[in-house]
Amino acid sequence: MSVPPHLEEWEPKTKLGRMVKEGEIKTIDEVFAQGWKILEPEIVDWLLPDLEEEVLDVNMVQKMHKSGRRVRFRVTVVVGNKDGFVGVGQGKAREVGPAIRAAIDRAKLNIIKVRRGCGSWECGCGRPHSIPFEITGKCGSVRITLKPAPRGTGLVAGETAQKVLEMAGIEDVWTKTTGGKGKGETRTTINFAKATFDALRNLIYVRMREEEAERLGIVSGSAEGA
């Protein structure tokens, strides 16, 4: 595996980081299987070099202080490889650039393995283009329900949820959302992103019989070879 140039001088600060750089752990699947907590974004950079990122929201926050008005930027970002791994994070800083970088790092630390499949009774193709079953996620007043959709449906979702789902590698899904009204566009964007992420995270906790998982074509993480 070729190492991205910016990682050649990386000096890991955690045991997991050292194991990754020394080649003891070679895949992100091993990290999840062994229950490691990711504390360095470079670990994700090393194991998922094809990760992409997209800014979902940039918000300027002003606070009055005895020395005058202070301005900070709060940024929400989604990262993913469009094949079963996705993360959402927020960052704050006095300038937009550093806030974006902080949000990207936080999103990498929050990365999860997404369970995909074909749970629509209208389809039954057995490929991981959708989700295997209906699932709900919440954040604040926002609640989103993801429902399996047949192949070719696309992502029937709001713009924010759509971006998170795309980064996770989900191609077809129906959604139903409640809440978030009257809270302001920025707060709603953040909550919808986090609620969608919460729903995707909840997929992994549902227990299924092996034969049922096989029928639904369930894949956790990368679908390469599926």
Curated annotation (Swiss-Prot):
One of the GO BP terms on file: translation
Keyword Ribonucleoprotein assigned: yes
A GO term, aspect molecular function: rRNA binding
Stored Gene3D superfamilies: 3.30.160.20, 3.30.230.10
UniProt feature coiled coil, ranges: none
Domain S5 DRBM: 51-114
InterPro entries assigned to the protein according to its UniProt record, in alphabetical order: Ribosomal_Su5_D2-typ_SF, Ribosomal_uS5, Ribosomal_uS5_arc, Ribosomal_uS5_C, Ribosomal_uS5_euk/arc, Ribosomal_uS5_N, Ribosomal_uS5_N_CS, Ribsml_uS5_D2-typ_fold_subgr
Keyword Ribosomal protein found: yes
Keyword terms of this UniProt record: Ribonucleoprotein, Ribosomal protein, RNA-binding, rRNA-binding
Pfam family, one: Ribosomal_S5_C
Cellular component terms (Gene Ontology): cytosolic small ribosomal subunit
Reported function: With S4 and S12 plays an important role in translational accuracy.
HAMAP family xref list: Ribosomal_uS5_A (MF_01307_A)
Entry comment, domain topic: The N-terminal domain interacts with the head of the 30S subunit; the C-terminal domain interacts with the body and contacts protein S4. The interaction surface between S4 and S5 is involved in control of translational fidelity.
Family: Belongs to the universal ribosomal protein uS5 family.
NCBIfam families for the chain: PRK04044.1, uS5_euk_arch
Oligomer and partners: Part of the 30S ribosomal subunit. Contacts protein S4.
Full protein name: Small ribosomal subunit protein uS5
